[in-house]
Structure formats: structure tokens, C-alpha cells
Design a protein with these regions (language model features):
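Short glycine-enriched loop/turn motifs at secondary-structure junctions
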Residues: 1-2, 48
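Negatively charged, low-complexity tracts enriched in Asp/Glu with abundant Ser/Thr
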Residues: 2-19
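Extended, low-complexity, intrinsically disordered tandem-repeat tracts enriched
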Residues: 10, 58, 91-92
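Periodically patterned hydrophobic/aromatic "hotspot" residues that form packing/interaction faces
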Residues: 17, 42, 62, 89-90
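Acidic, low-complexity, intrinsically disordered interaction modules
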Residues: 24-83
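Short acidic DE-rich linear segments
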Residues: 84-94
Length: 94
């Protein structure tokens, strides 16, 4: 398994990111595409075709997230767990 810890702008952004990318009850990944990146903000498209933005701490966190989530978007890997701790999100994929 592979994991990444991302630091968001605040606790709210961390909870939003965790809920947008993965739903624990159904084990589904909702993110289908990264639509745009503007500085430390990532705009994501989810399964229902809606767009949502999440603000991460800095550009390094954006690079970490976009690199980590790419294999999930390409359906090469699946997210199996997300956990928020303060303004951080731990994402685990297999």
C-alpha cells in the first residue's frame, strides 16, 4: 500500500478533500479529473460532473497531491482509506 499525508489550508479544507476523494461507507473514489491548479488551489471534477476546489498549504502540497492521485484517476490504483487529523489528510491507496 502507498500513502501520502497532505497539509491543507485549514481543518475545513482537509475534511472537504477527504470527503471529495473517497467515501468510506461505499469504498468509492469520487474524483474523476483534476480540472485546474491555481497556485495552491486544486479544482477537482467528481463523478456527478460537478467541480470543487480545495486549498492546500502550498505549491509543494499541490504537487504531492496531483502526483499521488494521478494513478487513481487513471484507474491504476484505488483509494482504500482517508483520515483527517487537524488540517492534514492521510490518503492510502493500493
Amino acid at each position: 500500500m502507498n500513502s501520502a499525508t497532505l497539509i491543507c489550508q485549514d481543518k475545513y479544507a482537509a475534511q472537504k478533500l477527504a470527503n471529495l476523494i473517497f467515501v468510506n461507507d461505499t469504498k468509492e473514489t469520487y474524483v474523476t479529473e483534476i480540472l485546474n491548479v491555481v497556485e495552491n488551489e486544486v479544482v477537482l471534477s467528481i463523478k456527478d460532473k460537478s467541480a470543487h476546489s480545495v486549498v492546500l498549504e502550498d505549491n509543494d502540497q499541490v504537487l504531492l497531491f496531483t502526483d499521488f492521485i494521478q494513478s487513481v484517476i487513471e484507474k491504476k490504483q484505488k483509494i482504500v482509506q482517508t483520515e483527517t487529523v487537524g488540517s492534514s489528510v492521510v490518503i492510502v491507496k493500493e
